[in-house]
């Protein structure tokens, strides 16, 4: 008997990692971006409210500048992010326009959610965009985000950013697309016996012990950051699905309740 998941998905946040948008050799995966635009546009046309949290600014910037490695110096990283974000949003605008879907860009820092006035204003911006049938595309403002002793502006990674956005705007579901099929009970790259876990109701210390590793060469997120995002969603009575973003049309399967990836909550 086929298992069908019960999901609430009126308002959905989709987080796409750099590994989905940029090939391992550093070139831009235009096919994946086009599929993402197609899926999200279809969701909007069917009445769902969708916010896209997109990584990739530095990865796209490296490609644009013909560089193979992320620079180590913060000013150089932030310069690459500024270049890449401009190119990335231009690609998104072009691809979404094919499907007659308008987009709007929001570049955020953590302190926006800390201070009441800016917090209130950014939530109003999200609501206004969604009301006008516009898809907000969100990224951390890497060009200015830094952590200082008395003033934190960085989210740390877009896994955390996506969960913070989702819980603040009252999203039912966070779909996190990455370069892995879901959450395993071991490292599938090192252990052939590792099993994909289809459903995790609660993220606890045992779950964290199963996780490990860091992000890709072009990204920053690892499994631990994804678990923290899932924990945040569960605490807010939401759900999160972690799935492989190699083919973004997997989102259709997720919304149909098919048991792909790992459901948290």
Swiss-Prot record:
Q: Does the keyword Kinase apply?
A: yes
Which chain positions lie within coiled-coil regions?
A: none
Q: Which reaction does it catalyse?
A: L-glutamate + ATP = L-glutamyl 5-phosphate + ADP
**This protein is called what?**
Glutamate 5-kinase
Q: What's the superkingdom here?
A: Bacteria
One Pfam family of this protein, by short name? AA_kinase
Record's keyword annotation contains Transferase: yes
Q: What GO molecular functions are on record for this protein? A: ATP binding; glutamate 5-kinase activity
Q: Which InterPro entries does the record match to this protein?
A: AceGlu_kinase-like_sf, Asp/Glu/Uridylate_kinase, G5K_ProB, Glu/AcGlu_kinase, Glu_5kinase, Glu_5kinase/COase_Synthase, Glutamate_5-kinase_CS
SUPFAM superfamilies in alphabetical order: Carbamate kinase-like (SSF53633)
Gene3D superfamilies attached here? Acetylglutamate kinase-like
Q: Which organism is it from?
A: Lactiplantibacillus plantarum (strain ATCC BAA-793 / NCIMB 8826 / WCFS1)
Q: Give the metabolic or biological pathway.
A: Amino-acid biosynthesis; L-proline biosynthesis; L-glutamate 5-semialdehyde from L-glutamate: step 1/2
Which GO terms of type biological process are on file?
A: L-proline biosynthetic process
What EC number(s) does the entry state?
A: 2.7.2.11
Record's GO cellular component terms? cytosol
Q: Which PROSITE patterns match?
A: GLUTAMATE_5_KINASE
The record's listing under HAMAP family reads: ProB (MF_00456)
UniProt subcellular location: Cytoplasm
Name the keywords, alphabetized.
Amino-acid biosynthesis, ATP-binding, Cytoplasm, Kinase, Nucleotide-binding, Proline biosynthesis, Transferase
Q: What is the purpose of this protein?
A: Catalyzes the transfer of a phosphate group to glutamate to form L-glutamate 5-phosphate.
- The UniProt record gives the binding positions of ATP as 15, 178-179, 220-226
